[in-house]
Swiss-Prot record:
Binds to the 23S rRNA. GO terms for molecular function: rRNA binding; structural constituent of ribosome. The lineage of its organism: Bacteria, Pseudomonadati, Pseudomonadota, Alphaproteobacteria, Rhodospirillales. One of its GO terms (biological process) is translation. This is Large ribosomal subunit protein bL9. PROSITE patterns: RIBOSOMAL_L9. SUPFAM superfamilies: L9 N-domain-like, Ribosomal protein L9 C-domain. Keywords: Ribonucleoprotein, Ribosomal protein, RNA-binding, rRNA-binding.
Length: 187
């Protein structure tokens, strides 16, 4: 079934594209959600009339989402969960749990905005992508720990490891710069 996209849809196309999709996907998702119109001459003409308004609305929504994304950049959320000795969680952290934690941090998002490929089943720190708009997404750090103290210790250890890596890279960069200057002087 051919449809006209009314907004950008990941892995499908941009607004205004006429794409061929499976009939069930069109009937059950795209058409009821008002993300697409059936591709007919009348609907193509209607879309062309409405195109400027739709693009302006999309631009406004994208700008609002970008403003929220700028505020959410670098957001780290702690989730306290029970876990066994090996670090395996009793249960898992799902997209709904992540959405609730981000809401508790003061941002309004829905569960469907959280892109979690698989549920989180072990302790640790994870980067989870939150799609605020089809064109705007931000990565939120989810720190899953047994307690707040354990999370602080893990964060301190990660920061120390990052400092060690930076300290090791800095002399290497200085050596490369020195070699480049000596090569330039020889030439």
């Amino acid at each position: 079934m051919e449809v006209i996209l009314l907004e950008r849809i990941e892995k499908l196309g941009q607004m205004g594209d006429v794409v061929n999709v499976k009939p069930g996907f069109a009937r059950n998702f795209l058409l009821p959600q008002k993300k697409a119109l059936r591709a007919s001459k009348a609907n193509l003409a209607f879309f062309e009339k409405q195109r400027v308004q739709l693009e302006a609305l999309n631009l406004k929504r994208r700008d609002e989402a970008q403003a929220v994304a700028d505020k959410m950049t670098g957001l780290s959320v702690l989730m306290v969960r029970q876990a066994g000795e090996s670090g395996m969680l009793y249960g898992s952290v799902s997209g709904k749990d992540v959405a609730d934690a981000v809401k508790a941090a003061g941002f309004t998002i829905e569960r469907r905005m959280v892109n979690l490929d698989q549920p989180i089943k072990t302790l640790g720190s994870y980067g989870v992508r939150v799609s605020l708009h089809p064109e705007v997404s931000v990565v939120v750090t989810i720190n899953v720990a047994r307690s707040a103290e354990e999370a602080e210790r893990a964060a301190a250890a990660a920061a120390a490891a990052a400092e060690v890596v930076e300290a090791e890279e800095a002399p290497a960069e200085e050596d490369v710069a020195a070699e480049e200057t000596s090569e330039a002087a020889e030439a």
